Amino acid sequence: MLDFSLKNKIAIVTGGSRGIGEAIAKAFAEQGATVIVCSRKQGGVDRVAEEIKAAGGAALGIACHTGQSAAIEVLYARVKQEFGRVDVLVNNAAANPYFGPAVEITEAAFDKTFEVNVKGYFLMAQHAARMMIEQGSGSIINIASIAGFSPPPMQGVYGVTKSAVIAMTKMFAKELGGVGVRCNCIAPGLVETKFAQVLIESPEMLEHFTSRTPMGRHAQPNEIVGAAIYLASDAASYT
Protein backbone atom coordinates (compact mmCIF):
# COMPACT_ATOMS: atom_id res chain seq x y z
CA MET A 1 0.00 0.00 0.00
CA LEU A 2 1.36 3.42 -0.91
CA ASP A 3 2.48 5.55 2.01
CA PHE A 4 2.12 9.29 1.48
CA SER A 5 2.55 10.06 5.17
CA LEU A 6 5.44 12.23 6.29
CA LYS A 7 5.16 11.18 9.92
CA ASN A 8 8.46 11.35 11.82
CA LYS A 9 10.26 13.00 8.90
CA ILE A 10 12.39 16.11 9.44
CA ALA A 11 11.93 18.51 6.53
CA ILE A 12 13.67 21.78 5.67
CA VAL A 13 11.76 24.19 3.43
CA THR A 14 13.60 27.27 2.17
CA GLY A 15 11.70 30.33 1.07
CA GLY A 16 9.12 29.07 3.53
CA SER A 17 7.68 32.35 4.74
CA ARG A 18 5.31 32.88 1.82
CA GLY A 19 4.05 31.61 -1.52
CA ILE A 20 4.90 28.10 -2.65
CA GLY A 21 7.28 27.53 0.26
CA GLU A 22 4.68 28.44 2.88
CA ALA A 23 2.10 26.19 1.22
CA ILE A 24 4.54 23.26 1.14
CA ALA A 25 5.67 23.80 4.74
CA LYS A 26 2.10 23.78 6.03
CA ALA A 27 1.13 20.77 3.92
CA PHE A 28 4.16 18.80 5.10
CA ALA A 29 3.21 19.51 8.70
CA GLU A 30 -0.35 18.34 8.02
CA GLN A 31 1.13 15.07 6.75
CA GLY A 32 3.08 14.61 9.99
CA ALA A 33 6.51 16.08 9.25
CA THR A 34 8.45 18.30 11.60
CA VAL A 35 9.17 21.31 9.41
CA ILE A 36 12.11 23.69 9.65
CA VAL A 37 10.82 26.83 7.97
CA CYS A 38 13.62 28.93 6.47
CA SER A 39 13.70 32.38 4.95
CA ARG A 40 15.82 35.48 5.33
CA LYS A 41 13.70 37.22 7.97
CA GLN A 42 13.03 35.69 11.38
CA GLY A 43 9.62 37.33 11.68
CA GLY A 44 8.36 35.64 8.54
CA VAL A 45 9.46 32.14 9.47
CA ASP A 46 8.21 32.57 13.03
CA ARG A 47 4.75 33.47 11.72
CA VAL A 48 4.52 30.36 9.55
CA ALA A 49 5.93 28.13 12.30
CA GLU A 50 3.42 29.48 14.82
CA GLU A 51 0.54 28.95 12.40
CA ILE A 52 1.68 25.37 11.86
CA LYS A 53 1.86 24.75 15.61
CA ALA A 54 -1.54 26.39 16.17
CA ALA A 55 -2.97 23.87 13.70
CA GLY A 56 -1.44 20.98 15.65
CA GLY A 57 1.74 20.53 13.66
CA ALA A 58 5.43 20.67 14.57
CA ALA A 59 7.66 23.42 13.20
CA LEU A 60 10.70 25.56 13.89
CA GLY A 61 11.49 28.84 12.17
CA ILE A 62 15.15 29.55 11.42
CA ALA A 63 16.23 32.66 9.53
CA CYS A 64 18.77 31.81 6.83
CA HIS A 65 20.03 33.66 3.77
CA THR A 66 20.62 30.70 1.49
CA GLY A 67 22.90 32.72 -0.74
CA GLN A 68 25.46 32.89 2.08
CA SER A 69 27.50 29.80 2.93
CA ALA A 70 28.10 30.85 6.54
CA ALA A 71 24.36 31.14 7.17
CA ILE A 72 23.78 27.70 5.65
CA GLU A 73 26.42 26.17 7.92
CA VAL A 74 24.74 27.70 10.97
CA LEU A 75 21.37 26.36 9.82
CA TYR A 76 22.57 22.79 9.40
CA ALA A 77 24.53 22.85 12.65
CA ARG A 78 21.33 23.76 14.48
CA VAL A 79 19.27 21.16 12.63
CA LYS A 80 21.84 18.50 13.45
CA GLN A 81 21.95 19.56 17.10
CA GLU A 82 18.18 19.68 17.58
CA PHE A 83 17.01 16.82 15.36
CA GLY A 84 20.07 14.75 14.44
CA ARG A 85 18.90 14.15 10.89
CA VAL A 86 17.20 15.62 7.84
CA ASP A 87 14.88 13.52 5.72
CA VAL A 88 13.62 16.07 3.22
CA LEU A 89 15.01 19.28 1.76
CA VAL A 90 12.84 21.55 -0.36
CA ASN A 91 15.01 24.11 -2.15
CA ASN A 92 12.48 26.84 -2.87
CA ALA A 93 14.12 30.19 -2.03
CA ALA A 94 14.60 32.31 -5.13
CA ALA A 95 15.68 35.75 -6.27
CA ASN A 96 14.76 37.68 -9.38
CA PRO A 97 15.79 41.30 -8.86
CA TYR A 98 15.61 42.28 -12.53
CA PHE A 99 12.92 42.22 -15.19
CA GLY A 100 14.13 43.26 -18.61
CA PRO A 101 16.40 42.29 -21.50
CA ALA A 102 19.51 40.33 -20.53
CA VAL A 103 21.78 42.82 -22.27
CA GLU A 104 20.77 45.46 -19.71
CA ILE A 105 21.15 43.50 -16.46
CA THR A 106 23.76 44.81 -14.04
CA GLU A 107 26.52 42.62 -12.70
CA ALA A 108 25.13 43.06 -9.18
CA ALA A 109 21.68 41.83 -10.20
CA PHE A 110 23.22 38.95 -12.15
CA ASP A 111 25.31 37.91 -9.15
CA LYS A 112 22.36 38.09 -6.75
CA THR A 113 20.22 35.92 -9.01
CA PHE A 114 22.89 33.24 -9.31
CA GLU A 115 23.89 33.50 -5.65
CA VAL A 116 20.47 32.46 -4.40
CA ASN A 117 19.08 30.42 -7.28
CA VAL A 118 22.15 28.36 -8.11
CA LYS A 119 24.83 28.57 -5.43
CA GLY A 120 22.26 28.56 -2.65
CA TYR A 121 20.47 25.51 -4.06
CA PHE A 122 23.76 23.70 -4.48
CA LEU A 123 25.07 24.41 -0.98
CA MET A 124 21.75 23.55 0.67
CA ALA A 125 21.61 20.27 -1.26
CA GLN A 126 25.27 19.51 -0.58
CA HIS A 127 24.84 19.87 3.18
CA ALA A 128 21.62 17.87 3.18
CA ALA A 129 23.17 15.15 1.02
CA ARG A 130 26.06 14.66 3.44
CA MET A 131 23.62 13.98 6.27
CA MET A 132 21.37 11.84 4.10
CA ILE A 133 24.27 9.68 2.90
CA GLU A 134 25.07 8.86 6.53
CA GLN A 135 21.41 7.98 7.10
CA GLY A 136 21.14 5.97 3.89
CA SER A 137 17.97 7.80 2.89
CA GLY A 138 16.52 11.18 2.05
CA SER A 139 14.73 13.27 -0.54
CA ILE A 140 15.94 16.53 -2.10
CA ILE A 141 13.27 18.50 -3.95
CA ASN A 142 14.33 21.47 -6.04
CA ILE A 143 11.71 23.98 -7.14
CA ALA A 144 12.69 24.88 -10.69
CA SER A 145 10.42 26.54 -13.27
CA ILE A 146 9.22 26.14 -16.82
CA ALA A 147 11.48 29.14 -17.38
CA GLY A 148 14.33 26.65 -17.06
CA PHE A 149 13.24 24.92 -20.27
CA SER A 150 12.64 28.09 -22.28
CA PRO A 151 13.65 31.42 -20.73
CA PRO A 152 10.69 33.83 -21.03
CA PRO A 153 10.87 37.45 -22.14
CA MET A 154 12.09 39.88 -19.48
CA GLN A 155 13.29 36.95 -17.32
CA GLY A 156 16.12 35.51 -19.36
CA VAL A 157 18.76 35.40 -16.62
CA TYR A 158 16.27 33.98 -14.13
CA GLY A 159 15.48 31.29 -16.70
CA VAL A 160 19.17 30.45 -17.04
CA THR A 161 19.41 29.89 -13.27
CA LYS A 162 16.43 27.54 -13.41
CA SER A 163 18.08 25.64 -16.26
CA ALA A 164 21.03 25.21 -13.91
CA VAL A 165 18.70 23.92 -11.19
CA ILE A 166 17.29 21.30 -13.56
CA ALA A 167 20.80 20.16 -14.52
CA MET A 168 21.86 20.20 -10.87
CA THR A 169 18.91 17.99 -9.98
CA LYS A 170 19.96 15.43 -12.58
CA MET A 171 23.54 15.54 -11.30
CA PHE A 172 22.59 14.89 -7.68
CA ALA A 173 20.07 12.23 -8.71
CA LYS A 174 22.80 10.31 -10.52
CA GLU A 175 25.38 10.74 -7.77
CA LEU A 176 23.12 9.97 -4.82
CA GLY A 177 20.55 7.49 -6.08
CA GLY A 178 22.78 4.51 -5.42
CA VAL A 179 23.06 5.36 -1.72
CA GLY A 180 19.33 5.78 -1.13
CA VAL A 181 19.06 9.55 -1.57
CA ARG A 182 16.58 10.79 -4.17
CA CYS A 183 16.72 14.15 -5.94
CA ASN A 184 13.88 15.53 -8.05
CA CYS A 185 12.62 18.88 -9.21
CA ILE A 186 9.22 20.45 -9.71
CA ALA A 187 9.00 22.96 -12.56
CA PRO A 188 5.83 25.02 -12.11
CA GLY A 189 4.41 27.45 -14.58
CA LEU A 190 3.21 30.86 -13.44
CA VAL A 191 2.04 30.69 -9.81
CA GLU A 192 0.16 33.51 -8.09
CA THR A 193 2.60 34.66 -5.42
CA LYS A 194 4.11 37.95 -4.33
CA PHE A 195 7.27 36.84 -6.14
CA ALA A 196 5.36 36.68 -9.44
CA GLN A 197 3.11 39.67 -8.82
CA VAL A 198 4.70 41.81 -11.53
CA LEU A 199 3.91 39.09 -14.08
CA ILE A 200 0.35 38.55 -12.88
CA GLU A 201 -0.37 42.28 -13.07
CA SER A 202 0.97 42.63 -16.62
CA PRO A 203 -1.70 41.68 -19.19
CA GLU A 204 0.98 40.94 -21.78
CA MET A 205 3.06 38.70 -19.51
CA LEU A 206 -0.02 36.96 -18.10
CA GLU A 207 -1.17 36.20 -21.62
CA HIS A 208 2.32 34.97 -22.53
CA PHE A 209 2.25 32.36 -19.77
CA THR A 210 -1.40 31.31 -19.77
CA SER A 211 -1.51 30.92 -23.56
CA ARG A 212 1.33 28.41 -23.30
CA THR A 213 -0.30 26.42 -20.50
CA PRO A 214 -2.68 23.58 -21.46
CA MET A 215 -5.07 24.56 -18.63
CA GLY A 216 -5.10 28.15 -19.83
CA ARG A 217 -4.55 29.75 -16.44
CA HIS A 218 -1.95 30.38 -13.76
CA ALA A 219 -1.70 28.27 -10.60
CA GLN A 220 -2.21 28.83 -6.90
CA PRO A 221 0.55 27.82 -4.44
CA ASN A 222 -1.50 24.95 -2.99
CA GLU A 223 -1.63 23.35 -6.44
CA ILE A 224 2.12 22.67 -6.25
CA VAL A 225 1.84 20.95 -2.89
CA GLY A 226 0.67 17.51 -4.03
CA ALA A 227 3.78 16.84 -6.10
CA ALA A 228 6.00 17.90 -3.21
CA ILE A 229 4.22 15.61 -0.74
CA TYR A 230 4.59 12.70 -3.14
CA LEU A 231 8.31 13.29 -3.71
CA ALA A 232 8.96 13.69 0.02
CA SER A 233 7.07 10.53 0.94
CA ASP A 234 8.02 6.87 0.86
CA ALA A 235 5.49 6.44 -1.96
CA ALA A 236 8.17 7.97 -4.20
CA SER A 237 10.85 5.45 -3.19
CA TYR A 238 11.67 4.75 -6.85
CA THR A 239 11.30 8.32 -8.08
Language-model features: locations:
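C-terminal substrate-recognition "lid" of short-chain dehydrogenase/reductases
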Residues: 122-125, 217-239
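Alpha-helical segment proximal to the catalytic Tyr-Lys
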Residues: 130, 174-178, 237
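Substrate-binding pocket helix/loop in short-chain dehydrogenase/reductase
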Residues: 100-102, 106-114, 205, 209
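Active-site helix of classical SDR
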Residues: 125, 161, 169
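Residue(s) in the substrate-gating loop at a strand-loop-helix junction
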Residues: 145
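Conserved glycine-rich cofactor-binding loop
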Residues: 10, 17-19
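Conserved glycine-rich Rossmann-like NAD(P)H-binding loop of the short-chain dehydrogenase/reductase
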Residues: 31-48
